Every structure is written in C-alpha cells, then in structure tokens.
Swiss-Prot record:
Tissue specificity of this protein: Expressed in brain and to a low extent in atrium.
Keywords: Cleavage on pair of basic residues, Disulfide bond, Hormone, Secreted, Signal, Vasoactive
InterPro entries on file: C_natriurtcpep, Natr_peptide, Natr_peptide_CS
Cystine connections: 115-131
A Pfam family this chain is assigned to: ANP
Protein's recorded name: C-type natriuretic peptide 2
Biological role stated in the UniProt entry: Exhibits natriuretic and vasodepressor activity. Has a cGMP-stimulating activity.
Transmembrane feature ranges: none
Propeptide feature: residues: 23-109
SMART domains assigned: NAT_PEP
Protein family according to the UniProt entry: Belongs to the natriuretic peptide family.
Length: 131
C-alpha cells in the first residue's frame, strides 16, 4: 500500500527534470496592424453612427447559403441572423449601449452621498461624529 504512493511521489519529483522546450508566441504584425486600423476607424463612433452604418449597408445573402447549400439541408440548430447586421456592428452597438447604461447606473447609485461617502457617513453617524 505504501509502494504505489512512493512510486507516484518519485514520478512527480522526476518529471520536472526532463528538458522541455517552449516556444514564445509573438503577435502577428498583420494582426497588430488590423487592430490599430480597426480602433482608428471605430474609436469615435456613437450609437447613432452605428445605426446609420447598419441601415446604409446593402442586404447581402448569408455566405452559408451562397455556397449552394439549400435551406432545407441546413441544420435546424444553426442560428440564422434575423437582421442584416454584421457581427462587428452588433458587437460595437452593444458595447456603446452598455457604456451609456453604465453612466446612468453610476449616477443613479449616488456615489457622493453625504460628506465622505456612504460608508464613512454610516461610521460617523454611529459614532456621533458626523460632518
């Protein structure tokens, strides 16, 4: 009963002694350039700009259906986009909507209650020191 435990412990101690080589992954210059161009282009967009972009795009059939695959052969579990929005535009629109919602949530919470904030005012009211 003690032998399997000793064998496992010995294997665990010996395993790191083997020489292993790792390769460092570097980002592709093309990927970095793409991200920089993407951020330069879409950095100052507002939600209205995104809606204008979406409405100005021509309706294109989905690439899955242009390859000759009939709709009846397409699996039922596959999501077919209801709108002609591209994935990037929907992502950006959702992000901008979340930013606007975060600003209103922050103002609704009322971070600046009292003299020193909610926690310190609570401590001050319990101790009777107040502001």
């Amino acid at each position: 009963m003690l032998y399997p435990a000793l064998l496992c412990a010995a294997l665990l101690l010996i395993a790191p002694l083997g020489h292993t080589e790792g390769r460092t992954l570097y980002p592709s210059p093309d990927a970095i350039q793409f991200v920089e161009q993407f951020l330069d282009r879409y950095n100052d967009l507002t939600l209205d700009d995104l809606e204008n972009l979406v409405s100005s795009q021509p309706e294109e059939p989905s690439s899955a259906f242009t390859s000759g695959v009939k709709i009846a052969e397409y699996p039922k579990w596959a999501d077919i986009p209801a709108q002609g929005d591209s994935t990037w535009l929907r992502l950006l629109k959702g992000t901008l909507a979340n930013q606007k919602r975060a600003v209103t949530d922050r103002s609704r919470r009322g971070w600046n209650r009292g003299c020193f904030g909610l926690k310190l005012d609570r401590i001050g009211s319990m101790s009777g020191l107040g502001c």
